[in-house]
Design a protein with these regions (language model features):
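Intrinsically disordered, low-complexity domain-flanking/linker segments in eukaryotic proteins
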Residues: 251-275
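Eukaryote-biased recognition of electropositive, low-complexity segments
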Residues: 241, 245-246, 259, 268-271, ...
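Short coil/turn segments at secondary-structure boundaries
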Residues: 117-121, 155-161, 209-215
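Active-site periphery "cap/insert" segments of enzyme catalytic domains
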Residues: 140-171, 182
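Extended hydrophobic secondary-structure segments that form protein cores and membrane-embedded regions
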Residues: 46-48, 78-82, 169-172, 229-232, ...
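Active-site gating loop/helix substructures
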Residues: 162-258, 316-327, 461
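Patatin-like phospholipase
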Residues: 13-35, 40-48, 53-149, 181, ...
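C-terminal helical/tail subdomains of lipid-metabolizing enzymes
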Residues: 2-6, 12, 236, 288-290, ...
Length: 497
């Protein structure tokens, strides 16, 4: 019988003094401490990694270019990341090389999360009892192994990390109990273990059990008021702003004791603009998007910023087949656009409904060839077309009936409107992924500002999406190279003359 990993869904947020770190001479891979002596003309001191699931592997290529340019690790003093980006932020906060990242981060990142026993049934039982299908112990242990290799302690705290590695690490997490984003950092949670915060930020709802934190005082009194934490990407998927303003500033003038006075007006500081402004020009942020995603930062791509040639892998071939379908749909868009315009012009009574005579007038006014009509409707017979669209059997066609018919012909009008393709969830994990992306995309769109463009490197992962798992080495090398090309293109475009 498979042994169930021990439950890590309940953890203690200790306010006690953490254990002392072992001598640096005893660690396996000594950290590289920043000294500002990197040979580069670029001003960057902060890195911010967006969440993105399987797309995150591209960050290895991005970090590799920063190494070549002399930016990382010697000049980087502050690092932040959300969801999968929090793991890369943790690695970068240690100052380890991109080669070390490539060696230690498993090819199948998803395997770190799926450690529940009992198959699908066991997962559903755990989801019902513990709010997650997998305990997340394997991920928690992996993070601890890395931290122990480089710092000497699997449970190194944010304060100790700053002391040993010389960098501030900030990890956004979602507090479900308070329904807000919190930032784990030396200023806010100095005695929290780094791997606890990283595990929280990677806690995809449903897939992984949430982390429940309570203070020493709560544990002593026995009060059941622990707070639940899940994936930071739910509310803060793009953390480029984290080192803006004063909220996470360690300057004594920005202490909470000073900034939060008077307490009766502290609520006025909740809006992002009140805490995270002005923008910090020393921050370099990274975003990720697949080829089918319409990301706001796609329009920020610099010349030469494009993915490499696709490898001949199963994931790439599957995506190519989907592209063919989308191309056929795209070929239909222009004649359909003309159809909608002409239907509006022939709507004599302006009631938004289409009568049989109005449809006949539209298709016979010379705007459409017989080929266009067949392409859209599959036939050129007006009566047959009307009956196909007239789902309720009435005298007119409602606009909703027209849209429903067009969708049966392969045109997703909703996708054309919002810019994101439909992605029907195949299981509960896909459902959770769609849910978190729906929220994070909307928030990212509303929070992205013009200040972010000159400090953001958009990375296209082409055929690799957030949930494109079971990748082979050729896929991973493709993403590393894509991250490298996009980062190099950005730096070349912003290089000082």
């Amino acid at each position: 019988v498979a042994r169930e990993p021990k439950d890590t869904s309940i953890m203690l947020l200790s306010n006690a003094e953490p254990r002392d770190l072992p001598p640096l001479s005893s660690v396996k891979v000594p950290p590289v401490v920043p000294n500002g002596q990197g040979r580069t003309s670029f001003p960057y001191e902060n890195l911010a990694f967006e969440g993105g699931g399987a797309k995150g592997y591209a960050y290895i290529g991005a970090v590799r270019v920063l190494e070549e340019e002399g930016i990382y690790p010697l000049n980087i003093r502050r690092v932040t990341g959300t969801s999968i980006g929090s793991m890369f932020a943790m690695f970068a906060s240690l100052g380890v090389s991109s080669a070390y990242m490539e060696e230690r981060i498993p090819a199948d990142i998803e395997s770190l999360a799926k450690d529940g026993s009992g198959g699908a049934l066991g997962g559903f039982i755990r989801a019902a009892r513990r709010k997650g299908m997998n305990p997340g112990q394997r991920l928690y242990d992996f993070l601890g192994e890395i931290l122990e290799e480089v710092t000497g302690s699997a449970d190194i705290t944010f304060a100790q990390l700053h002391e040993r590695c010389g960098r501030e690490l900030a990890i956004p997490v979602t507090n479900v109990t308070r329904m807000m984003t919190e930032f784990c950092h030396i200023k806010t949670t100095p005695n929290m273990a780094v791997r606890v915060a990283t595990r929280m930020s990677m806690s995809l709802p449903v897939l992984l059990q949430p982390i429940s934190l309570r203070s020493v005082y709560d544990r002593v009194t026995g009060e059941a008021n622990a707070e639940l934490y899940v994936d930071g990407g739910l509310l803060c998927n793009n953390p480029t702003h984290v080192f803006d303003g004063w909220w996470l500033s360690t300057d004594p003038r920005d202490s909470f004791l000073r900034r939060l006075q008077p307490l009766d007006r502290a609520s006025a500081l909740y809006p992002r603009s009140a805490r995270f402004s002005p923008a910090n020009p020393r921050t370099l942020g990274f975003t990720l998007f697949a080829g089918e995603e319409t990301d706001i930062t796609r329009s920020w791509l610099e010349p030469g910023a494009e993915p490499p040639a696709r490898p001949d892998t199963e994931a790439a071939r599957e995506y190519a087949e989907k592209e063919k379908v989308r191309q056929r749909q795209s070929d239909m868009q222009r004649p359909i656009q003309r159809l909608l315009q002409r239907l509006d012009e022939h709507d004599v009574d302006s009631d938004g409904r289409i009568s049989r005579d109005e449809l006949r007038a539209t298709l016979s006014d010379g705007s459409f060839s017989a080929q266009d009509t067949v392409l859209i409707f599959g036939t050129s017979d007006v009566d047959e077309i009307f009956e196909h669209m007239n789902a309720d059997g009435g005298d007119t066609i409602e606009f909703g009936e027209l849209l429903s018919f067009l969708e049966t012909r392969g045109l997703d009008v909703t996708t054309s409107l919002v810019g994101f393709p439909a992605r029907p969830p195949k299981n509960i994990v896909d459902f959770a992924m769609n849910l978190i992306e729906a929220v994070s995309r909307d928030l990212t769109r509303s929070n992205q500002t013009g200040d972010d463009r000159p400090r953001t490197i958009p990375i296209s992962t082409d055929y690799v999406g957030t949930t494109t798992f079971n990748l082979v080495d050729a896929d991973l090398q493709f993403m590393i190279e894509s991250g490298r090309k996009h980062t190099k293109a950005f730096l070349d475009a912003h290089r000082a003359d």
